[in-house]
């Protein structure tokens, strides 16, 4: 089986409609200024599609992790329920206005925005305040999520999801609204994310190398287990590499190690061997006695790490080996940095991998996918993000997809081959979302699984 194809925004009629778009504007903000607008820019094609065709946009997003108030809480006299200054989307509205070259209306309370929505005309854009100012958005109780979803759904006619970064969340705005409206469409960013991951997981150009880093083996167990049946090479870096190396009997000094995962590391290495997957681990290291950024850290001559030292990046010999394996592959998927790239003296390994992928993509047609989160940040910092085939906007979502899990925010969207509900067809009525589509009832859509081919 493969990823179930979903209807995209191109399948929806948006002219004259108020289109609810769940975007991912969870961007870094410092002193009221956005420091990286990548996620805002990534949503522009979907927004511009609606505006060009004469629809209006009602945008929903979260930012940060505010505590969240209850819908039943008394409304403050001079504020809104759940408001936190550090998590307001007002700076996003200002930046989006600059990018679109037009005014973006801002509703200061996402659940008290009916008057704003009612005034919208074709070509208008409205951004709702942070949906997570309300605890019901991500409540564990379905009835609470549904109550919030009904309020939001009443603002519009058509639902589009372009928030891959939160597709692994079962929330009022990701799964609740399409259930209320009876249909949901993938925006261009969501569609792009799904298509790239589907290709690399189900039918990639080969050889395929997975580059996996980060701090803990325990964080990547399911990813490694799922990917071993799909890849040709496995490159391991970051602190998780030292658990594998201790499991092989090497000295790791005072480097980070999950002692309770040594047997698991041995098991994964054995499974890789059984499946003819070549595993590459560091053969030298950049070390220090303390976790600090010094200009002249110790570089080991071989795989062994001296007593009293911790490894904080891969060494030059390892970099060359990793560059060579990337150069001979046709596809790469990268999740997790090779070292503490935030400190310049430990960034060489991570940046070298990024450069090797970027060069391979631009010069040799390598399919290169960055799995979001810290890896996306590292690619941006290295200057190589623009050279990749795809930089995912979803850290947690991409990780769960690589682990072989289905994503609730994708599963709920209308299937490409969906038929009109029998009752609606018999009555000859319009589809629930008002778009003219053949919509799937909520009950049917909710049971569709987004499944990857078994390794």
UniProtKB/Swiss-Prot annotation:
Keywords: ATP-binding, Glycolysis, Glycosome, Kinase, Magnesium, Metal-binding, Nucleotide-binding, Peroxisome, Transferase. Pathway: Carbohydrate degradation; glycolysis; pyruvate from D-glyceraldehyde 3-phosphate: step 2/5. Residues 417-455 are annotated as: Topogenic signal. GO terms for biological process: gluconeogenesis; glycolytic process. Its cofactor is Mg(2+). Transmembrane segments: none annotated. ADP binds at residues 214-215, 220, 238, 311, 335, 341-342, 374-375. Mg(2+) binds at residues 215, 219, 374. Pfam families: PGK (PF00162). CDP binds at residues 214, 219, 238, 336, 341. (2R)-3-phosphoglycerate binds at residues 23-26, 39, 61-62, 64-65, 132, 168-169, 216. It catalyses: (2R)-3-phosphoglycerate + ATP = (2R)-3-phospho-glyceroyl phosphate + ADP. One of its GO terms (molecular function) is phosphoglycerate kinase activity. It is found in: Glycosome. InterPro entries: Pgk_euglenozoa, Phosphoglycerate_kinase, Phosphoglycerate_kinase_CS, Phosphoglycerate_kinase_N, Phosphoglycerate_kinase_sf. ATP binds at residues 215, 220, 239, 311, 342, 374-375. Signal peptide: none annotated. AMP binds at residues 215-216, 220, 239, 311, 342. Its EC number is 2.7.2.3. GO terms for cellular component: cytosol; glycosome. Belongs to the phosphoglycerate kinase family. HAMAP family: Phosphoglyc_kinase. Monomer. This is Phosphoglycerate kinase, glycosomal. It comes from Crithidia fasciculata. The gene is PGKC.
């Amino acid at each position: 089986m493969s990823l179930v194809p979903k209807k995209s925004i191109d399948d929806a009629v948006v002219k004259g409609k108020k289109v609810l778009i769940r975007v991912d504007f969870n961007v870094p903000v410092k002193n009221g200024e956005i420091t990286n607008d990548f996620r805002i820019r990534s949503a522009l094609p979907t927004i511009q599609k609606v505006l060009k065709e004469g629809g209006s946009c009602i945008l929903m997003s979260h930012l940060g992790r505010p505590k969240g108030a209850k819908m039943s809480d008394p409304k403050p006299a001079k504020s809104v329920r759940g408001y936190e200054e550090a998590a307001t989307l007002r700076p996003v509205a200002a930046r989006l206005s600059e990018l679109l070259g037009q005014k973006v209306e801002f509703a200061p309370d996402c659940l008290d925005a009916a008057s704003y929505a009612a005034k919208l005309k074709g070509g208008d854009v409205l951004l709702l305040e942070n949906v997570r100012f309300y605890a019901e958005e991500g409540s564990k109780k379905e009835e609470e999520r549904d109550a919030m979803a009904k309020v939001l759904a009443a603002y519009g006619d058509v639902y589009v999801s372009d928030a891959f970064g939160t597709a692994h969340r079962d929330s009022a705005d990701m799964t609740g609204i399409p259930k209320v409206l009876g249909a949901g469409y993938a925006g261009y960013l969501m569609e792009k994310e799904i298509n790239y991951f589907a290709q690399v997981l189900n039918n990639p150009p080969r050889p395929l190398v997975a580059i996996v880093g980060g701090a803990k083996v325990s964080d990547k167990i399911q990813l490694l287990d799922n990917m071993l049946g799909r890849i040709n090479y496995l490159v391991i870096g970051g602190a998780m590499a030292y658990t594998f190396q201790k499991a092989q009997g090497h000295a790791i000094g005072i480097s980070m190690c999950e002692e309770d995962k040594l047997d698991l590391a041995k098991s994964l290495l054995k499974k890789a061997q059984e499946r003819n997957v070549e595993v590459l681990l560091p053969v030298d290291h950049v070390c220090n006695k303390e976790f600090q950024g010094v200009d002249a850290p110790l570089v080991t001559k071989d795989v062994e790490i001296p007593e009293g030292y911790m490894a904080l990046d891969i060494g030059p010999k390892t970099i060359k080996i990793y560059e060579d394996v990337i150069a001979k592959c046709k596809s790469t998927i990268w999740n997790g940095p090779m070292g503490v790239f935030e400190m310049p003296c430990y960034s060489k390994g991570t940046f070298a991998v990024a450069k090797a992928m970027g060069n391979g993509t631009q010069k040799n047609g390598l399919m290169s996918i960055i799995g979001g989160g810290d890896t996306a940040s590292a690619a941006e910092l290295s200057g190589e993000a623009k050279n990749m085939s795809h930089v995912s906007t979803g850290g947690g979502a991409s990780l769960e997809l690589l682990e072989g899990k289905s994503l609730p925010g994708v599963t709920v969207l209308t299937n490409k081959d969906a038929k009109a509900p029998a009752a609606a067809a018999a009555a000859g009525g319009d589809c629930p979302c008002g778009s003219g589509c053949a919509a799937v009832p909520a009950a049917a859509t909710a049971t569709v699984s987004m499944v990857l081919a078994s390794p």
